[in-house]
Amino acid sequence: MAQLRIALAQTNPAVGDLAANAARIVEWTGRAAERGAHLTVFTEMSLTGYPVEDLVLRTSFVEASLAALEALATRLAEEGLGEMPVVVGYVDRANLAPRVGQPKGAPLDGAALIHRGQVVVRSAKHHLPNYGVFDEYRYFVRGDRLPIFRLHGVDVAIAVCEDLWQEGGPVAVAADAGAGLLVTPNASPYEREKDDVRLALVSRRARESGCAILYVNQVGGQDELVFDGDSLVVSASGELVARAAQFAEELLVVDLDLPEARFGGLGTFETEAGDGTVITVERVELSARPLEPYEPLTPTVAEHLEDTAEVYSALVLAVRDYVRKNGFQSVILGLSGGIDSALTATIASDAIGPERVHAVLMPSRYSSEHSLGDARELVERQGINSRLVPISGVVDAFEKEIELSGLAAENLQARVRGTILMGLSNQHGHLVLTTGNKSELAVGYSTLYGDSAGGFAPIKDVLKTLVWELSRWRNAQAGRSGEFLYGFARPPIPENSIEKEPSAELRPGQRDTDSLPEYDVLDPLLHDYVEKDMGSAELVAAGHDPALVARIIRLVDLAEYKRRQYPPGPKITPKNFGRDRRLPITNRWRETTL
């Protein structure tokens, strides 16, 4: 057996900021060298950020990526880090003639090995995901190479992200090609329970291939996606050896005992990949002789977050990175005293600090004194900025000019509030946070250009019952501080905001249950219809009331046009409103209850 010390660089790149991403790669490679690493592995497309979407269809962007890769190799050598082998992700291109159905320029989701100022080998993702949030058939052509480099007597293979999730391809070839270690750069977005699925997958692939696997995952928020890190090292027998933290950057350094190289030959050869394709295996040698034995480091296995803490951390990171990466210094939101705006304000305070959160209290003639009191109580507990802007006078002015009644009059109040928030955003440069939850978005219980107006929607993918669960969990953390918890001495959310019956307060005595069933009845139905794509017959067979099924399906289907105009927000479920669920607005198909 031979020893290797490997550094897994779980970083948070910014899409399109090639210079900053490259500087970070150099910085973290230096940190890995200080800790005695023999190899440093970065995440998928760590040089360009991920996902880059249609940027890869621009020749200028692909050329910039290729130039940045060469410049990075030179810079690492100039910084005295040339002896450190470094695996980085970037955008490459294939030498293919243009053809119909092929992405312009034939881009590749590439991974490269840099050593001694040179790009030694290049690889690219073979399996292109085209489901859920992924559209990689649109953006990339598949790679067909498996690089294996010999480092201190160990043969190390490189495969990218989805190649680990699918059968066949480079991972299937790695073991037969003699690899003792498989490194996989990843940009695998978060959703609930995915961490358990991910560990089970990596363990199974390790056992199948007979290779230890390094799974290096991106961390950070990128528009609707949140990347949770949670990088893994698994032995050839499938046992967890080391694990990085969730939702935080980390340099995870681990020592492994690995089998010495079995094959002597270098160069290239072709082999069947088990998925009907042929993979070209490319062997190169960096160093043939194993290292002298040394005292290994004790491996680190980060404490895993329980589900509620995991979801809350994802929401905080999403808000923090959306604000930071888009150049905002502060956020603004309407604070009603209800639970949705209370949770949104708390997430924002935890993300960027209460001093950068601005709340606007906008009571109408229908707002209760206790709601205004609850909003003021939250402001006091958290120390956020606030201002009071009563809306009755503005609403009255509208109604003098335009005669409105019923729902139109109710929605006018929400639209006045939205206009006030957008005006203050324009004046002061705040990012407007909308406060709607997934249950409301599903059934259209929101006002277009009113409470839906804004730039980012932190709880867009959070069902109402989970809003309450997250709020109670956050209050239970009072007195604690950390990466995702501002150190509030008292529970940051007033208890009355959690316990009172929800209401939009747009008419006298209004309650959500005037229009909707109880949320503990509604949310399971929405979960089954939206996230599990059950039809009406399946929903009834699952135990949902037939009349309610018919009513809720109709509401969900008719609200598609509203959701298309809603701001982006972080995905935390297997199917969010946005990238995951794509339905026509003009659509006459209706489910029927059988």
Residue ranges and their predicted role:
Residues 1-334, 350, 361:
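Enzyme catalytic cores with a strong preference for nitrogen-chemistry domains
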Residues 150-152, 210-211, 236, 260-336, ...:
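ATP/NTP-dependent adenylation/nucleotidyl-transfer catalytic domains that generate, transfer
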